Regions:
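Short, mixed-charge aromatic SLiMs
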Residues: 45-55, 101-103, 130-131, 135
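N-terminal polyanion-binding entry modules of DNA glycosylases/AP lyases
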Residues: 1-90
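Catalytic DNA-binding helix-loop module of base-excision-repair DNA glycosylases/AP lyases
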Residues: 20-27, 78-132
Length: 136
C-alpha cells in the first residue's frame, strides 16, 4: 500500500519539512536505513504533522513503528519531540527532545543548507563530499 523511499537517496533527501526530518532522525536511531525507508512513508501518511501524532491513538502509532524495534522508547521520543516542535524556533535542532548531533548536523545540511558543518556520521560526511563538494 505504501511505497518505500528510494534506496539510492538518503532519507533526508526525500522528505519535505523539518518535522518529517526530525521523525526520520528518531526512526534512524539504532535502526537500518532500509527499515526506515519502508516504515516512514506509512507513518507520515497517518501522521503528517506533529499535531496529528499528538492526537493519534497510541497503540495505532506504535503498531506502525513496531518493525523498527524499541517501540516504547521510539514512540516516547517522537511524542516528546513533537511537543517541543510546536514551540521550537527552528534554530538549534538539538533543543528538540531526542535530536542529538546527528539530527542537528543533518538539519543544518538539508534544511539550512549550512555546508560548513563537520558531521561525525559517515553517511552525512559522504553526502557532503560527493553531493555538495563534488569530491570523488
Amino acid at each position: 500500500m505504501f511505497n518505500p523511499l528510494r534506496d539510492d537517496l538518503m532519507v533526508q533527501q526525500q522528505i519535505t519539512n523539518s518535522w518529517e526530518h526530525m521523525v526520520g532522525v528518531i526512526m534512524l536511531n539504532q535502526t537500518g536505513r532500509k527499515a526506515v525507508k519502508t516504515t516512514l512513508p506509512e507513518f507520515l501518511y497517518w501522521f503528517p504533522t506533529a499535531l496529528a501524532l499528538l492526537h493519534a491513538d497510541e497503540e495505532f502509532a506504535k503498531s506502525i513503528i513496531e518493525p523498527l524495534g524499541m517501540v516504547n522508547v521510539r514512540y516516547n521520543r517522537l511524542i516528546r519531540m513533537s511537543q517541543d516542535y510546536l514551540t521550537w524556533d527552528g534554530n538549534d535542532a538539538e533543543k528538540l527532545f531526542g535530536i542529538g548531533k546527528y539530527g542537528s548536523d543533518s538539519y543544518e545540511i538539508f534544511f539550512k543548507k549550512n555546508y560548513a558543518v563537520q558531521p561525525t556520521d559517515k553517511e552525512l560526511k559522504r553526502y557532503l563530499e560527493q553531493e555538495v563538494h563534488n569530491v570523488s
